[in-house]
Amino acid sequence: MEHETHTHPRDYRSLSLTHRRSQYCNYAGRGIYLITLCTEGRRPLLGELCGDSPARAHVRPSELGREVLRCWEAIPAIQRDLAAQKSLRTHTTCHRDIELLGCQLMPDHFHGIIFIQQPMDIPLGQVVRGFMIGCTHAYHTMLKSVSIPTVLQHPGYRSTVGIHTDIRLAYLPTSHPLWEKGYHDRPLTRKGQLQTMIAYLHDNPRRLFVRRHSARVFELRRGVQVGAQVFDAMGNHALLQRPMHAVHVRRRFSGPERRAYMNACILAARQGRVLVGAFISEYEQQVRAVALREGHAVIQLTTDLLTDYYKPSGELFDACGRGQVLLLSQRTTLDSFSRRITRAECNTLNTLAEEMAGVNSLSPPHPPPQ
């Protein structure tokens, strides 16, 4: 299939995590949340990735990183004190019972899992904002202890002050932010999700190691034309040169038809075809899982917005690192809140997959003889 890269007018490099709130969540109520904060400009201020293999990868905190961890661990006590002070001042009962379930410091961002044990008088955002302010205060305090020549070498600082002056940073602006504006949160919504969150946190250093040492297969290209369609693409772009087989398990398939169809998809992969699809239904995901486990290739159509900092999740991440996956997306904007894929989007992705594979429709396969 013909494909080429076009100049793409959109630039996602500076996208932040601002306003990624769920419109359906009560952020002052009881709940568990995975929060993510990124340093302004994604500067690696918080630590350094160490280790000589994915299994041994870990992050060694910088001095600032240790202060961030200290501020994180202080959240429950600080919020209890603030609630007690407000109760005395307003003659009301204020509860801010918070438990920290885990965290992971990375060079340019921070993940934490926070448990609001009972309804609070303030939303989660105020708790996170207090944590961010505490970290920023520590950051500015550290800046003031560093001489001008050292700071002028910092990639995040721009100054017109002469290099040869010996004044301290007390005379310099400390308004340069530590964190980018806003943060991302993911509420726990189903049973078993907490363990997934914790595993994701602990897996972050390994994932960073894999991505740094497999930069080619995580390469993001914008404006990749496939037939009449234009996509943003991440992964093994060479997969576009290979014959494809569309995967779309129809609802109308009977049990035998579905099994025959899924087997036919795996057979196509074993014959060298790249499986292409949205892989939305559980049956389509089963086909993808078997194909990846056997070492075959997959082109995943997604509604995710692909940015320079995007990383595929779950089995797709490791498969992408092995060169088995290409992600394609036509998403051009960042939603103001998390949402699920719509039925119309599902239909569009399935149609695109069939067009890429060179077919107009997929007929149910004949069931195997009984």
Features from the language model and the residues they span:
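Glycine-biased, small-residue-rich flexible motifs in mid-sequence functional cores and linkers
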Residues: 220-370
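Short catalytic/metal-binding and nucleic-acid-binding patches
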Residues: 1-228
